[in-house]
């Protein structure tokens, strides 16, 4: 039985593992955390239909139970390529072998504290979109002082489309995440005022535009085109922001009870050593380079090493699931062709 090692037990890794196992392969998922699910564990509800994240995660976990070796709290320390495939050295002096390797290590969230002018980690009432999502999960939406926020601002593209931050790419999901979160806030705090400060709004997915219109028409959420220049904390712990309204070409000051920073996706650096060992190439933006972004998007430059999900760039969960299902066919074809090649090389033995 051909074996496959999947590094990363998030959405992409779990879905790929399930499908590969159903195809009859021996699958090992290597996850460095104490539970699978990746960033989905941090989320409350998903756009655009606000389906509970826990529901999607439970489905992925249940399917992945079938015939899969799940190694939690496990880290790959070294990989070596050999004639049969790959030898993976793990922490605690463990070793496994595999005929193919699938990189599913996902992304990292931008560290908002690097944008000091925004005040995250400095001012108590400046939070990130992830912090807000976890507050939704707990059912407690309050300021640091325990008050219900009545005036809330969202800043788009924090750590995305920002060359100074080293991330010139668009994170793809921040705009719709902000809209979804703003609507949920408005439903929980009907008398609140909510302001969205953006560079450009990119509602590319199905039903995204409808959700954006709902935010404006039904919930009266205000969208202001402009970039935050600075945030200050007032004596009462409210946050004052300075923004330039780029449509009106006017500076703007506003006091807020809560400021939410929509943090973007950036490449994960947790497997840099592995990539170096295998000589897997990265793109200029730091995400893994696809062998052919149109025809073979899951292949890397190294035969037998595949990549799936947000390790190759920002994606929605739906796109990640589709990517994971597609890569299973790529891996199956690779292993089938490898077996066929060995048979052809040895055909003289049967003549």
PLM segments and residue spans:
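Residues forming the flavin
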Residues: 1-351
């Amino acid at each position: 039985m051909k074996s496959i090692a999947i590094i990363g037990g998030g959405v992409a890794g779990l879905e790929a593992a399930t499908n590969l196992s159903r195809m009859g392969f021996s699958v090992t998922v290597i996850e460095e955390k104490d539970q699978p699910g990746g960033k989905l564990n941090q989320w409350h509800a998903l756009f655009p239909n606000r389906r509970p994240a826990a529901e999607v995660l439970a489905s992925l976990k249940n399917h992945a139970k079938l015939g899969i070796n799940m190694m939690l709290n496990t880290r790959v320390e070294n990989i070596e390529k050999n004639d049969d495939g790959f030898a993976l050295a793990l922490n605690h002096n463990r070793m496994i072998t595999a005929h193919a390797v699938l990189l599913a290590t996902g992304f990292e969230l931008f560290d908002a504290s690097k944008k000091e002018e925004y005040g995250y980690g400095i001012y108590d009432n400046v939070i990130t979109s992830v912090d807000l999502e976890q507050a939704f999960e707990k059912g407690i939406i309050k300021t640091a002082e325990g008050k219900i926020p009545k005036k809330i601002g969202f800043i788009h593209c924090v750590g995305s489309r920002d060359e100074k931050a080293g991330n010139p790419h668009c994170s793809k999901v921040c705009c719709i995440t902000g809209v979804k979160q703003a609507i949920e806030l408005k439903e929980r705090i009907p008398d609140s005022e909510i302001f969205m400060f953006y560079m450009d709004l990119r509602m590319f997915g199905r039903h995204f535009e409808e959700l954006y219109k709902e935010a404006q028409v039904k919930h009266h959420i205000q969208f202001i085109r402009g970039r935050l220049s600075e945030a200050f904390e007032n004596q009462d712990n409210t946050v004052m922001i300075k923004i330039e309204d780029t449509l009106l070409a006017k500076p703007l000051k506003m006091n807020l009870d809560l400021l939410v920073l929509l943090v973007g996706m950036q490449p994960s650096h947790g497997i840099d050593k592995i990539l170096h060992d295998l000589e897997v190439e990265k793109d200029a933006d730091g995400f893994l380079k696809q062998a052919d972004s149109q025809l073979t998007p899951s292949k890397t430059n190294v035969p037998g090493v595949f990549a799936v999900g947000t390790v190759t760039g920002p994606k929605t969960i739906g796109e990640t699931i589709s990517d994971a299902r597609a890569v299973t066919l790529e891996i199956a074809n690779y292993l089938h062709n490898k077996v066929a090649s060995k048979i052809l090389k040895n055909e003289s033995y049967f003549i």
